[in-house]
């Protein structure tokens, strides 16, 4: 089965999409819970009742299992797992990253994954550790690409979707080039691999650089899977970068360790006096009861998975409403490392602007980071297309008397962080749908970028800015050729 990927809605680089084939449909973005047949805390059938549309399991574990190997070969994964959604299999690369070797070849794992009727199959790529030196990364990437192309030659593309993993360590040029080669080779499902160590050590800024480099090389039509991303606190950030699917065993691993997941971090269950969640597990138990329950691990896994699935829906709604930046901002303020990742992503705002939608439901100013959002970048690009008269007034106040404007050929108002706008744009996005608090220095500086752009494209105009006295020195410093007057003069 070759899955097709259709993009339905977008915000920033995030997409709501649909993976479909042979009657199976997966809405994206989505989470693929990891299924270990030997440690089945939540049966896949029960997951499906919770809204899970796709899962991932490890083909290498099945191939080595006396209990499950023959069942999977005889009945197929869908019957063995009792799950009729999309099933993806990992080749054994996870074991390769943990143990350094696996007793299976690339051709063997492709053949086995097809034999057990996996929907999405993965070649035996080498998940090079992010801190590996470039020479090692290049050598292992070369082996990975050879294996991917070997898999492409031998795979049954009519009945299976072959994934093309994007490796390349921390080197953006290698990630980008790999993504480009995979897209040119026709791959339409590409996981970004070997990033779990970055997430485990909270290196989100580096994660952003890796993902953005890979995305730069990949075709926009490619469905992008972020291997091993399983904590709900970072789903919004990952989706904003353009990741469509995630997989993780975190829901179960955290439960085994007694950790309780939330969208802003995790708690050890024995530290909680109250359960801040309305899921059935939390409504039906106090923190003490849950901690002392003989079924604690399973119940905690149920909670963790429900929290993760709810966050996926929250991200989808944010995309639909055009407010994904605000959800990213909210989530990334839960930890300094996530905030670093958020700020790093904003450094790609020019690239993201080209992918973002043009109009949105609203713009809420939430701090300095809002000044670098794509809506602001796009407005600064647009403002250069406006025409200014020979004598132009830019007023920081909307309340000016007609006699104060009579000597000017054109009048613009000022709304930071966007900048100058004519009265005709008052009700249009983003001017009319943006909410900002009292002016602050950073938003004024950013708004002045818009003024500078208007001046640049209207070189014959003489500009006068009227503002409160508190801003005069700052504006004179940023725009030294502009005449600055006090409001009311």
Swiss-Prot record:
One of its GO terms (cellular component) is cytoplasm. Keywords: Glycosyltransferase, Metal-binding, Transferase, tRNA processing, Zinc. Zn(2+) binds at residues 277, 279, 282. It catalyses: guanosine(15) in tRNA + 7-cyano-7-deazaguanine = 7-cyano-7-carbaguanosine(15) in tRNA + guanine. Substrate binds at residues 125, 194. SUPFAM superfamilies: Pre-PUA domain, tRNA-guanine transglycosylase. Binds 1 zinc ion per subunit. It holds the Pfam family TGT. The active site is at 90 (nucleophile). InterPro entries: ArchSynthase1/Queuine_TRR, TGT-like_sf, TgtA, tRNA_ribo_trans-like. Its cofactor is Zn(2+). It is an enzyme of class 2 (transferase). GO terms for molecular function: pentosyltransferase activity; zinc ion binding. Its EC number is 2.4.2.48. Pathway: tRNA modification; archaeosine-tRNA biosynthesis. GO terms for biological process: tRNA wobble guanine modification. Exchanges the guanine residue with 7-cyano-7-deazaguanine (preQ0) at position 15 in the dihydrouridine loop (D-loop) of archaeal tRNAs. NCBIfam families: arcsn_tRNA_tgt, tgt_general. Belongs to the archaeosine tRNA-ribosyltransferase family. This is tRNA-guanine(15) transglycosylase. It comes from Methanospirillum hungatei JF-1 (strain ATCC 27890 / DSM 864 / NBRC 100397 / JF-1). The lineage of its organism: Archaea, Methanobacteriati, Methanobacteriota, Stenosarchaea group, Methanomicrobia. The gene is tgtA.
